[in-house]
């Protein structure tokens, strides 16, 4: 019994006992209805939302995917959303997206910044600028 029980403890697998840090993830939306419902729920928060407007055929978008995933892991206080312009053309049009990738930064339901193109450093700078919250 002891052997079976001990394998469930983290130290039995050389795992740390401390709790895991919550990893942010990129949320993909495939319907306008789900996006609008989610967007409405964010209007009451001060959380920065980064919308990644992308397309499956877009080479620079694919190059940015691992960078966005890294940012989501690093900036866990920021929400990262992915919207395919071919699936949700109405949402892309609403934000004036004309080129991919386009990153729209939103706080309290309002656009606070925008980056057009695969500009990793520019996006990082704007995320760091807008994620600062005053308590």
Where do the language-model regions lie?
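Acidic, Ser/Thr-rich intrinsically disordered and amphipathic helical segments
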Residues: 34, 63, 67-70, 110, ...
């Amino acid at each position: 019994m002891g052997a079976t029980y001990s394998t469930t403890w983290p130290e039995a697998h050389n795992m740390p006992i401390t709790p895991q840090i919550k990893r942010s993830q990129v949320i993909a939306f495939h319907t306008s209805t789900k996006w609008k419902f989610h967007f409405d729920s964010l209007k009451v928060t001060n959380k920065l939302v980064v919308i990644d407007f992308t397309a499956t055929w877009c080479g620079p978008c694919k190059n940015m995917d691992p960078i966005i995933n890294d940012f989501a892991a690093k900036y866990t206080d920021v929400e990262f959303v992915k919207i395919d312009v071919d699936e949700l053309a109405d949402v892309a049009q609403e934000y004036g997206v004309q080129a991919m990738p386009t990153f729209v930064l939103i706080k309290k339901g309002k656009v606070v910044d925008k980056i057009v193109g695969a500009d990793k450093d520019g996006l990082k700078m704007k995320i760091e600028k807008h994620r600062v919250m005053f308590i």
